[in-house]
From Swiss-Prot:
Keywords in alphabetical order: Cell inner membrane, Cell membrane, Membrane, Symport, Transmembrane, Transmembrane helix, Transport
GO cellular component assignments: plasma membrane
Spans through the membrane: 10-30, 46-66, 78-98, 143-163, 190-210, 224-244, 291-311, 332-352, 354-374
Pfam families associated with the record: SDF (PF00375)
Classification lineage: Bacteria, Pseudomonadati, Pseudomonadota, Gammaproteobacteria, Pseudomonadales
Name this protein carries in UniProt: C4-dicarboxylate transport protein
Entry-linked PANTHER family: AEROBIC C4-DICARBOXYLATE TRANSPORT PROTEIN, PROTON/GLUTAMATE-ASPARTATE SYMPORTER
GO biological process entries: L-aspartate transmembrane transport
UniProt main location, coarse: membrane
The organism of origin for this protein: Pseudomonas syringae pv. syringae (strain B728a)
Molecular function via GO: fumarate transmembrane transporter activity; malate:proton symporter activity; succinate transmembrane transporter activity
Classification via PROSITE patterns: NA_DICARBOXYL_SYMP_1 (PS00713), NA_DICARBOXYL_SYMP_2 (PS00714)
Subcellular location: Cell inner membrane
Mode of membrane association: Multi-pass membrane protein
Gene: dctA
Family: Belongs to the dicarboxylate/amino acid:cation symporter (DAACS) (TC 2.A.23) family.
Amino acid sequence: MTTRQPIYKSLYFQVIVAIVIGILIGHFYPDTGKALKPLGDGFIKLIKMVIAPIIFCTVVSGIAGMQSMKSVGKTGGYALLYFEIVSTIALLIGLIVVNVVQPGAGMNIDVSTLDASKIAAYVTAGQDQSIVGFILNVIPNTIVGAFANGDILQVLMFSVIFGFALHRLGAYGKPVLDFIDRFAHVMFNIINMIMKLAPLGAFGAMAFTIGAYGVSSLVQLGQLMICFYITCALFVVFVLGAIARAHGFSIFKLIRYIREELLIVLGTSSSESALPRMLIKMERLGAKKSVVGLVIPTGYSFNLDGTSIYLTMAAVFIAQATNTHMDITHQITLLLVLLLSSKGAAGVTGSGFIVLAATLSAVGHLPVAGLALILGIDRFMSEARALTNLVGNAVATVVVAKWVGELDTDKLQSELASGGSAILETRPEDDLGVAEGPTPGAAVNTTKTV
């Protein structure tokens, strides 16, 4: 029988305290808050440092260990189908809500008076986005370049190809697979060490956000923010909740299960900061490693529900605020463009704003200079985007795993019932809970049976 650790030692509690202190420092000592930005940036860089090798190890180990390669294609096909359906629903919900509530109506902003200099970099980056360019960018110029740049889709593509090739080698490739499994243990132990700094990273990022933008920036455009936050919450509870209920689990229990990851995302405004832990947690939840390795990384570009809601709401808000007429044809065009452009948003801070810039440029009817209206509050809105994205990818993983018959439902219910509270104490073999690698002489195949 294990003893539950004191609450002050839990990451959940530590991150909450860090966020609260960061808000207070940023509000009362804004200059100090802005100076703490390197703490948040440093933490995210530490996480990004190990994301590429972790994705590689997880995907390769999962694919190479599968009995049939048909399962990989089936999983990928179901995942993309789910992503397209749910992200389209998210885009539609954002479009409907912003038309009903009309948060930008009555602002009567003259576009010529807006300072477009601050958004120039975003517009330039957005203009570089194209469908063909996005597809070609998935193919890395070099293997080393994919890992050096940390491009999730490039790393994922190479990992899938490597996994297929390793599977074809059969027993001859087993030493390589054994090495990758052991290397994965090292990477996840590095994550375990980095996560001890999560409260510090959340503290620095939150202090900077409040110090740089201030609470006053929330008041001016508060209606849009409140509308967006409520829409995201309703989407999670009713849309994702209905999907979860239809597949035999509770959305609220799932949220409780990933509460630590949600708090890390809240503090850093980046869903990417929780990616390594999500890979482990979703596997512990009963999803097969091969499914988790494909769905989670792919979802970070193709299943961003919060970003989808944001894109339609922000685009129409700019039209309303600048009195730019948008009839049904314009809005359908916007929706069709977003169905493609939204797939290029990675789970990093600021990517949603770049995609919005690309969308406004592509549509042509909307004033790109209107981006200056929401630049000041985008950082605050990115938190709701990232949280919704994370929950959406967690639901997607469980659903796709169930669709392809790679979900241990008994384990799912058991883990959700426990809330993941004993995750560090009771399983010394788990990657997040150990400080040492596999025991010498032990079996080298670390793929967990589900």
